[in-house]
Amino acid sequence: MTRLTIFYILNWLGLTIYIVNTSLYLSHGEMGVFQIIMAVNTPLFLIITIKAFTKGISKLFKSDEHEFRYLASSLLVFTYIFTGIDAKVLAIYRDHFNIKLFGILFETGVMQDLGVRSSDLFSLGIQIFGICIWVWISLFVSNWVFENKRNKGSELTSQNIQIAFKILIYLSMVEKLLFSYFHYTDRERINGYWASIPSYTVLKMSKVWKPFIHTSPDSEREAAKITWNFENDFLLAQSQFKRNISNMTAEKTNVNIVFLVFESLRSDVKIPEIMPNLSRLSREWISSDRHFSNSNCTGNGTFGILTGMTPFYWYPSYKAEYQPTALTILDHLGYNIDVYTTTKLGYSDMNKHIFTDAVDNVYEFTGYGGGLGHPMVKRSDLYKWDEMMVDKFLTNFKSREPSTPSMSYLWFYSTHYNYYFPESFGKFKPYIDRHYQIYEPELQKESHLVFNRYKNSAFYADHLIGKITDAIKESGQSENTIIVILGDHGEEFNEFGRFAHSYSLKNVQSSTPFVMHLPGILQSNYKVTSHADIMPSIMDFMGVSIPNNQLFSGKSLLQYNEDLDFAIVQECEIKNRPKKFLIADSDWKLEFTLSKGKIEAGNLETILDKPISSIEGVDYTQITKELLKKAKKNLGHFSNSH
């Protein structure tokens, strides 16, 4: 026994109690045998790591481990704090806290969106103080036991402790190796365990397992290679477009364009009970029941709406700060481009590569920010800003100069977390009406109350849609106005263990309603549409002289091509090149990765997010190949050599 033995044991017990309880909650009270082993082993592995590091440093300085007790204490305090943060992140995203999530959570405005208050920070400070006190007490107790009780313990007991500790180390490594194998072979249920245990560390040993388990044939490896530089080819195409823009014309230059874009509006709210106006318009105008955003978060989704580009081209556009081709065209044609928003345009640097200099006027209704202590919480009246925005737009639309065509982009906030609406629109009851946090331990049990709150905000948003479309109709401008109604991305309410968005490619997060009024055109034959198809359809309708395929990688909904009846979605990224994508057709969804010059297939599911099952006569390998072939072709859209 050393001076720190009891110190490590006490903190192992403390971490075990917290991690096992948290894992039980995240698993909805149902833990498999292997998950219990993982949950119990996690705190042991953390303690072993801290002890090994502290002992290694002490040996480096030729000193006793006890001399570095404050280093061990600091590491333990950090471990407790990180484990607590990781538990909250798991409750929201079902993934462990990492660099990507750090970028998402600390993007400008996100903490305000989450409703973080000064009292929440004060509570966090109290918890950290409590952790420090506990670690200090455990250190004090360990030192006291060593000073006063060590002589009362037999040498045999001390040896038994050492033997037991070594056995636990071996068992810990066996568990880690087993999970590494299960993780590599993509055992879905076992991977679900990983997403329910805070601070669980995976030993990533793909290079060890790959030679024994998965040996791809040469033809498969060759097919996966990307032999062209699609990003450079895209940039060259943009340069060519800039040279040709001066000679570009359009058949229709007097048609107005109105975008009604709603934060976090998921596809299944387009029903008469929740959004009667939108449901009615979907039967009268072009619509799609399988419409996908470019991504599951705002920046990437908005990129698709205004650029007409599929997700492969977000990163090069973002890095080069390219103005959307469609906005350049409209600007060239003399359009007055106005943006009305209740969201800051600087979010995800959208003011640099989406809402660029082509925009003539920006009407911001974002005066609700009052710092962390501001009551921008669940019972706030942020919906009033959407009302003010609509009134301003209608005033401008009715008084605009008829000879100057306009594009108006209205961006609504009411349907964003925390979901805002007047009390008179509280149709769906009961709904949550207290201050709540998205990472609360008990919120999963109240997900139906949160969802009702969301449906009320969608019901209110539908009222605004009716107000705008009715006003345009009454003004006599309907047959001269393109109207597009959609969400920037979807929103999850614990259907797959998560809340909100940004971290899953399931339909609830990546699919949105889509309704578009193109005067004289009632329908499209496409079964699957995406944000990237909107601008190509508008430019096709206007009769732009440059062919669509030279301008966009999305498709025009006016020109049916069976080979293009699909949508591509990317993972949420704020500043980095995305690696994970999804392609969806009318029946299937395939996740795939694009990295290091290779495109490789991942999980295949039905279009309804159901796992595939063995059905006689269904060739899943062929389905995967066909979907991957379509994705690869779109990847080479601007590459002449491909």
Residue spans of the language-model regions?
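Transmembrane and membrane-interface helices of multi-pass
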Residues: 1-205
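Short, solvent-exposed loop/turn segments at secondary-structure junctions
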Residues: 15, 262-267, 296, 310-312, ...
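Active-site-proximal alpha/beta segments of enzymes that process anionic O-linked groups
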Residues: 170-437, 554-557
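A short beta-strand-to-alpha-helix junction
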Residues: 317-324, 448-460, 504-510, 521-537, ...
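A long, amphipathic alpha-helix that forms part
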Residues: 390-398, 432-481
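Histidine-centered active-site microenvironments of extracellular/periplasmic hydrolases
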Residues: 473-520
